[in-house]
Swiss-Prot record:
Belongs to the bacterial ribosomal protein bL32 family. The keyword Ribonucleoprotein applies. Coiled coil: none annotated. It comes from Parafrankia sp. (strain EAN1pec). This is Large ribosomal subunit protein bL32. GO terms for molecular function: structural constituent of ribosome. One of its GO terms (biological process) is translation.
Length: 56
């Protein structure tokens, strides 16, 4: 099994870990103007793609 020849420095470790960040979710507007995730039904008005799919 491979063993590291040298210890990884703290700055190298932290620089590598700095890339592990969560992305903000993409947001869209429903036809009534509410902010939703794309390709999902609006939980406020129950519409998807300008159609009523759920009675809220």
């Amino acid at each position: 099994m491979a063993v590291p020849k040298r210890r990884t420095s703290r700055s190298n470790t932290r620089s590598r870990r700095a890339q592990w960040k969560a992305k903000a979710p993409a947001l869209a507007k429903c036809s009534r103007g509410h902010t939703i995730r794309p390709h999902t039904m609006c939980p406020t008005c129950g519409r998807y793609n300008d159609r009523q799919v759920l009675d809220v």
